[in-house]
């Protein structure tokens, strides 16, 4: 039989129970495994360790950088779907993830978190690195890359020159000029003191990260050296952590394939305008796409169209000229093979025509936006011009002329209202918008 408590003891019972529960919880916090503990109390270190592997920090300095890692660890970059490690992280199979970003934990704005390449491709690349040194599959990737002849040249270099990037598969470096490479170094955001064309302020770690990024995917470099704040059609680069980069958020163009006719006309008009600015600009750089799909373009919430993925963008310097890279297989090494087969042949700089990007867009994207949207005879004119614009056999002037005609047709098909905030209300008072 349970002993009976006196009045005073009975009165104290709720307090004793609370104290016992507190002591019990405290003792459990020293004895529970980490997996159970994380569900009771926020554990910064536990979340940090889990995040390192997912973000690829365990592979650094064979990574993009670490400039935005603190935001991840302070949970100032987060999503409703993966707020902390014990709630589960996104599937590894994705190349990008929507998230929210804050500088003060009060005001949040949408961002996208990108992998440079898929997790599967990263694993293949890492195995290639180990195999290049006849090392086990779980070798120190950084140690192997540091011992390469190319990186040893980088360590001695004071300036990034075309010979140091020859053989890399990135379209950005296919036809490099010294002016372009100086711009890469001067605007590289993953070092503390950017601004100089010389790499005196680069540590060994900084040089390896830059080389690795250029070898795997030049998308984050293009965001840094041609920023949207200066009028380039690219989203803002917010920083990198491990093998991920963070940039401002856009909706992929394919989400607008069923848009109303006036919105489709506006996006097509913008798309042609973007290609025109890449072909002709004040800095005399000619940008071209090696291939195109709808996921490479995105639309901000104000209706403005930008290049969402610049990994397939090449650059030719029309002012200074370019030095042909990778002649006769020269300077091919493990850095040349991280994302493609070492035997992959790249087109020569001279084979890149002014019409190349236009032809690709007119073949693959504009028909999905414009076909069957407008009444005759406007639709007939659009369809006819798309055939001319997408004909790779036609001379450059004919393709460029067809694109200009298409812009003239699309301009009056656009409407002026708040859906197009990037040009509203200016469009009410100025035909330019």
Curated annotation (Swiss-Prot):
Stored Pfam families: PIP49_C
Similarity comment text for this entry: Belongs to the DIPK family.
Lineage: Eukaryota, Metazoa, Chordata, Craniata, Vertebrata
Database matches in PANTHER family: DIVERGENT PROTEIN KINASE DOMAIN 2B, GH11358P
InterPro entries for the chain: DIPK2A/B, FAM69_kinase_dom
Signal peptide: 1-31
Glycosylated residues in this chain: 100
Subcellular location: Secreted
Keywords: Autism, Autism spectrum disorder, Glycoprotein, Secreted, Signal
Taxonomic source organism: Homo sapiens (Human)
Gene name of the encoded protein: DIPK2B
A Gene Ontology term for the protein's cellular component: extracellular region
Disease: Genetic variations in CXorf36 may be associated with susceptibility to autism.
Protein name as catalogued: Divergent protein kinase domain 2B
